[in-house]
Amino acid sequence: MKLSLSPPPYADTPVVVLISGLGGSGSYWLPQLAVLEQEYQVVCYDQRGTGNNPDTLAEDYSIAQMAAELHQALVAAGIEHYAVVGHALGALVGMQLALDYPASVTVLISVNGWLRINAHTRRCFQVRERLLYSGGAQAWVEAQPLFLYPADWMAARAPRLEAEDALALAHFQGKNNLLRRLNALKRADFSHHADRIRCPVQIICASDDLLVPSACSSELHAALPDSQKMVMPYGGHACNVTDPETFNALLLNGLASLLHHREAAL
């Protein structure tokens, strides 16, 4: 699997791995790259079956497989220890990595994540799946911003959204791959395993997230043995895109604090 690695800004730079959500594209993290690359070696990638890592995914594709293939690619790149920043599905992959490779994952940042899928989130995806079956890729792509962004943010950026729609259609991962990745997301359940995650965790959520209620992050916070929770009052599901200034400050402070906390505990 292809990875994109930024040059380390200094010797022994900590590595930060960015894992996007269901869309799978590493470019999702563009608003964070410039600030992160000043302090860390940053790993971005398109998830298997998407973008520049095309593949046909098995029907039983799982979050555990997503975690394993990423870890193997990191080891092949010479990376033994790394912090993880995961958004939604990416946060699930991050938790799986922390469970399966505890010696490798130093810190986890969960952005609008959850323990197991909430009934509201399941309802949102049910509607989106029906759009996919009835209207194809175009209907899926055109509806997607409604679940990602606040209404006023979208209303002020109509040309940008049209350009994003065209790009998403041009690079659509395919119906079968999308549904198999979505099914993996829906099957994931960390409610009985989260207490085994030993790395420090920062939870970031947006109170106005339409797709994943912020209560999901509260449940996650309560289940993890070593976590802190930060709530953004605005930004929607893609809060790192809509309010990068606020998000980046939380992310940078969280990474620095948790990495120091971990080093002090060793």
Swiss-Prot record:
Look up the domain of life of the source.
Bacteria
> Which of UniProt's keywords are assigned here?
Hydrolase
- Gene Ontology terms describing biological process: nitrogen utilization; uracil catabolic process
Q: Which InterPro entries match?
A: AB_hydrolase_1, AB_hydrolase_fold, AB_hydrolase_sf, Pyrimidine_utilisation_RutD
EC number(s) stated in the UniProt entry for this protein:
3.5.1.-
Q: What class of enzyme is it?
A: hydrolase
Task: Indicate yes or no for the key word Hydrolase.
Answer: yes
A single GO molecular function term of this UniProt record: hydrolase activity, acting on carbon-nitrogen (but not peptide) bonds, in linear amides
Its UniProt entry gives the catalysed reaction(s) as: carbamate + 2 H(+) = NH4(+) + CO2
Under Pfam families, the record lists: Abhydrolase_1
- Record function comment: Involved in pyrimidine catabolism. May facilitate the hydrolysis of carbamate, a reaction that can also occur spontaneously.
UniProt-listed PANTHER family: MONOACYLGLYCEROL LIPASE (PTHR43798)
What family does the Swiss-Prot or TrEMBL record give for this protein? Belongs to the AB hydrolase superfamily. Hydrolase RutD family.
Q: What is this protein called?
A: Putative carbamate hydrolase RutD
| Gene that encodes the chain | rutD
